[in-house]
Amino acid sequence: MKTKFFFISCICILAISVSIVACKKSNRTVPVQLLLTDNPTSYDEVNVHILDMKVKMNNDEGWTDLNTKDTTVNLLDYQNGLTILIAEGEVPEGTLKEVRFVLGTDNNIVVGGITHPLQTPSAEESGLKIKIDKHLEETLNTLVLDFDAALSIKEENGNYKLDPVIRWNP
């Protein structure tokens, strides 16, 4: 009888241990870096002021800030396969759902040698969001974000507005 009770107790303890381990959230992180590139366009320059880059994982814990240098990037300097590192960091393992660009106010476009302000209506407040939905591996995860300047710029009566068209290359 004692042997049967001992055996059943061991089975119960094992089952409880397995269920606790299976339900425990992983605290592991994986490395990620974001690169930026652009398609060719006829503008002289398209300068975008990047303040911050954030990612959202599938764990619903909100946005994770990446290491981002506050910088202004001429998108046209990164065409035909050229890229620039704009952010990197460690994020919780899992599936990367979204990337968010947070832009500053120093955005402009140069057309025919003349600099014009580039309006970015929501990008300075809520940021530009890109849906990704990519499972991240334990090794370095590099995502190339293609910011299409030609399709993103809208001109009306001499005013230029940024309506971003950003794709990522899986």
Give the predicted meaning of each segment.
Residues 1-10:
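Bacterial N-terminal signal peptides that target proteins for export
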Residues 9-17:
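Bacterial N-terminal signal peptides
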